[in-house]
Amino acid sequence: NQGTSVVENLIIIPNSDEVTSINLNIDKSIYLGNALICKNTNIKYTATATYPVRVQSKEASIIIDRCTISGLLFGSGFAMPEVKDEASIGYFGMTDTNIKVENTGTNLYLVTNMNCNELRFENNIVYYSGVPEATSNVENFKVFQGPSYSVNKLTLTSNTFIDIESGYSNGKTSAIVYPSKIGDITVNKNIYYFTYREYPAFLIRVASAEKSKVTIAENNYAYLFETGLTLNVFQNKIGDTSVGFTSNDVDLYDTTDPATFNKSTGTFIPKEGYTQYGAQR
């Protein structure tokens, strides 16, 4: 519970053989001055409003590694600027982490409305733990939301998204990463999977496509469920690059086998032939 006091550096890492993980319950926003680093930490947000992290500085660093995250709220998310245009992120790295979304709603953003020099989102699982249907599903989820803000370098690799919609109501299409531009894009070995889907869905969308560059975009897999809705890696053409999923019609999981597809444990292991894609656990 930090209240409105500024924390310059918050570092949470187990440092003994006896303690292999730490439970971090956040019931008020952390006003971040410089760096947040969490490793092997079970992060649970227990407040009833706003974001867990409010960034107050330019070029702040956020590093989340081998963690679990739960309790994030719709209408907010994980990190936001305390004052618009007076905060930015130098490095945002989330790796080997599970994000469990237990409720349904619209607009859940991990990072919103800040420039980000480098965004690395790698080997993570993001999943809705319930059973999606027309009246209850996860809509407009974003790793990065900021069509007026830029990401200079994006690495989006080896992630698994389960029943997480990037689109939302009224036919509005969007993407899991949506900045104004991305200077350099690597998007590789991701799995985007639905047991139910209502809207078109994409991994990446940019507001200024001509100012973005694709370095690697390959080996991304998706499954559409039983719909004809569009699902693509890029919502719009980026430079001369228009890339779809390597496959979007192969059912990648045996959803009847709790040893390989289990929302209660966060276990998602693809069928043989596809185990090298998505998050590795």
Task: Identify the role of each PLM range.
Residues 207-281:
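Acidic, glycine- and Ser/Thr-rich low-complexity intrinsically disordered tracts
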Residues 34, 77-79, 92-97, 167-169, ...:
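Non-transmembrane, interaction-prone segments in cytosolic or luminal domains
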Residues 9, 23, 118, 153-155, ...:
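Acidic/proline-rich low-complexity IDRs
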Residues 4-15, 20, 33-45, 58-72, ...:
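Right-handed parallel beta-helix
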Residues 23-29, 49-54, 61, 75-82, ...:
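Structural detector of coil-to-beta-strand junctions
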